[in-house]
Amino acid sequence: MAKATEKRVKRAKKEESGSESEDNDAIAQEILDTTKSDNEEEEPKKSSKNYTSVEVDESEEQTKTFKDLGVIDSICETCEELKFTKPTPIQAQSIPYALEGRDIIGLAQTGSGKTAAFAIPVLQSLYENPQPLYCVVLAPTRELAYQISETFEALGSAMGLRTAVVVGGMNMMTQAVALSKKPHVIVATPGRLVDHLENTKGFSLRTLKFLVMDEADRLLDMEFGPSLDKILKVIPRQRNTYLFSATMTSKVEKLQRASLVDPVRVAVSTKYQTADNLLQYMVFCPFKHKDTHLVYLVSENAGNSMIIFARTKSDTQRISLLLRNLGYGAIPLHGDLSQTARLGALNKFKSGSRNILIATDVASRGLDIPAVDLVINYDIPSDSKSYIHRVGRTARAGRAGKSVALVSQYDLELYLRIEGALGKKLDSYPLESEAVMLFSERVAEASRAAIQEMKGEDGTKKRSKFDKKRRRDEMDIGEQ
């Protein structure tokens, strides 16, 4: 701790002596370098930066309590109320170092409890030294930002915690009013936070004590590098920084060197594992009958909560319309929807008023969607990690779950790559071709209607018996 504090003091003195601009130029170069190449190696080069490294196995049983980690009684009591019975591996290893004042690099997958791993130390520090604009958490997506805010609010409920979510797609003026109320914690996407730093009168982060970058690998993959650079330039150099990421790529390594001081690196090993209570299946089907097989699977699992993953926004919308035309409660989730519609879709799915979510990979990481019974991969993802993240939406918190991959003749190479990474072959889903093809005529009609609607053709008289139902469901999408 003394070493980290000494380095922070040196940084603060540089700011006072006017040499901050040189450091900021160095930061700018470091961060902007992270976005130069799309073909960088997945694993980082050896860094000259020294840090303490802790490796922990995800399957390792935890015997410590939150109190054993040094967490204060009031937060421990809140953890009990939230049913956080024992710390997860990432929490058990990172929280004690964070409470000592160390910067943290946390390498862990979604569902590992990493949000609480950085929220608890921030809240404990805030409890001991309450002041506004204490912490900023940066997230790559709007949905994840709201999820993080909910976790902070739950853990900080006994403290009267004030939070503000600042993301794109929402009203700037409303957000400016929320910022003027001096929240303790701001959860933001980088681009919108920069908008407020540059345009919202009276708003600054000069008193900031904590910066958290969650899912840093995605922040950089989504080319937030220039925005991160601007943020790092205007916040105090004497602060605590937590960087959490699913992978330690070379881009993340550069970001770590530019923004952290003497960090502790806590890595939770997963080895491309899926949950033991997850049943994984595949269905080989000709591409032209893919929709028919999908509808058969949905029919066989009617009443269950399911997420169907598609590769493109267009397919997400089309499949949603197709299923709704057939009477299923399906809602889409993709980047072309307004923020209100996206939150409305998530709320309806979480509450159970709609039980089928058709999503692009925006929903495969970071979102806490409980009690999903089935994941269907309509399109095979292009890499094994995405597959792990997708099927990880089910079989959570000890529950059983099931996943099915639809594999056409065009997906074989990708599918075999995933089997190789998993180290096992997936079982074939039990079905009878005759039973599947009984759906083909109805599916073809519903599909034509969906495509016609997406093209915006009028054809009111020619179009189908599905029109009234479509209009009703369209209104449902945007509801909160």
From Swiss-Prot:
Residues 1-63, 450-480 are annotated as: Disordered. It is found in: Nucleus. A motif (DEAD box) lies at residues 214-217. InterPro entries: DDX47/Rrp3_DEADc, DEAD/DEAH_box_helicase_dom, DEAD_box_RNA_helicase, Helicase_ATP-bd, Helicase_C-like, P-loop_NTPase, RNA-helicase_DEAD-box_CS, RNA_helicase_DEAD_Q_motif. It catalyses: ATP + H2O = ADP + phosphate + H(+). Residues 95-266 form the Helicase ATP-binding domain. Interacts with the SSU processome. Residues 462-471 have a biased composition (Basic residues). One of its GO terms (biological process) is rRNA processing. Coiled coil: none annotated. This is ATP-dependent rRNA helicase RRP3. ATP-dependent rRNA helicase required for pre-ribosomal RNA processing. Involved in the maturation of the 35S-pre-rRNA and to its cleavage to mature 18S rRNA. Residues 277-437 form the Helicase C-terminal domain.
